[in-house]
Amino acid sequence: MSKNQEISKKEQYNLNKLQKRLRRNVGEAIADFNMIEEGDRIMVCLSGGKDSYTMLEILRNLQQSAPINFSLVAVNLDQKQPGFPEHVLPEYLEKLGVEYKIVEENTYGIVKEKIPEGKTTCSLCSRLRRGILYRTATELGATKIALGHHRDDILQTLFLNMFYGGKMKGMPPKLMSDDGKHIVIRPLAYCREKDIQRFADAKAFPIIPCNLCGSQPNLQRQVIADMLRDWDKRYPGRIETMFSAMQNVVPSHLCDTNLFDFKGITHGSEVVNRGDLAFDREEIPLQPAGWQPEEDENQLDELRLNVVEVK
């Protein structure tokens, strides 16, 4: 076996391992939140970024072995941004044999007309895009709308709201749309962004830039993203622990009177969640429980174009 063949075999092994982890993460999220049910028609929102490509790929993979039947239809919204490569997604989806629909709406022109030069356009653009996607879901008969937000997005949103909004609110893996007509799911809710990035690099997805409209990144969100990235580097495993905390909320030990009846605590009340014993010093492991460094972490960084289709 030549050296190149050995490298290729090693890359393929690592890619298979990475895809299995993403598949497991998505499968667990789907099961935990009952995201997909028998007969569902899932509208997969495809932006042309790494997250939505990965979401579509993993859902297609799960579709082949899932114990239930569900269908997928990929939808892209062409907002008529200057320089948008209109041919990329149709060519990619036709090659895959995936049902798809390209929705053409000049939201870019509307935003430019309504928002003064220099002001952020993201809020209005998001509202317009959301309305169009909801309408499209109805037209296609979709029972669920799948978005490509991942675990890091969810954590960033939690800290963004805590730091700047004074709210403990994140981004739920499943919700009812604001018009009350659609169920929105986030199958990548348990997936790490760095895993998605490595997978996208290895699969060589035809990525479409996300800043064609000329908008600047959300500075507050960038601050939070940089902070979490630094924590992940300095304290490995803490990101996993913080995400687990979002799934283990104890209302009686917070301060929201809407979530817990603090006024109702009187002499004779039952002890709730161990009372003040919850604050006694506990043995806390140096490494977060359940977390282990991955032996192939550096190898995964080397995955690029030189791979074959995962079966």
From Swiss-Prot:
Entry GO CC: cytoplasm
Pathway field: tRNA modification
GO-annotated molecular function: 4 iron, 4 sulfur cluster binding; ATP binding; magnesium ion binding; sulfurtransferase activity; tRNA binding
InterPro entries: Rossmann-like_a/b/a_fold, TilS/TtcA_N, tRNA_Cyd_32_2_STrfase, tRNA_thiolation_TtcA_Ctu1
Subunit structure: Homodimer.
Organism lineage: Bacteria, Pseudomonadati, Pseudomonadota, Gammaproteobacteria, Enterobacterales
Location of the motif PP-loop motif: 47-52
Enzyme Commission number(s) of this protein: 2.8.1.-
The keyword Manganese appears for this protein: no
Family under the similarity heading: Belongs to the TtcA family.
NCBIfam families named among the record's database cross-references: PRK10696.1
Additional remarks: The thiolation reaction likely consists of two steps: a first activation step by ATP to form an adenylated intermediate of the target base of tRNA, and a second nucleophilic substitution step of the sulfur (S) atom supplied by the hydrosulfide attached to the Fe-S cluster.
Cofactor note: Binds 1 [4Fe-4S] cluster per subunit. The cluster is chelated by three Cys residues, the fourth Fe has a free coordination site that may bind a sulfur atom transferred from the persulfide of IscS.
Positions of [4Fe-4S] cluster binding: C122, C125, C213
Entry keyword set: 4Fe-4S, ATP-binding, Cytoplasm, Iron, Iron-sulfur, Magnesium, Metal-binding, Nucleotide-binding, RNA-binding, Transferase, tRNA processing, tRNA-binding
SUPFAM superfamilies per the UniProt record, alphabetical: Adenine nucleotide alpha hydrolases-like (SSF52402)
Protein name: tRNA-cytidine(32) 2-sulfurtransferase
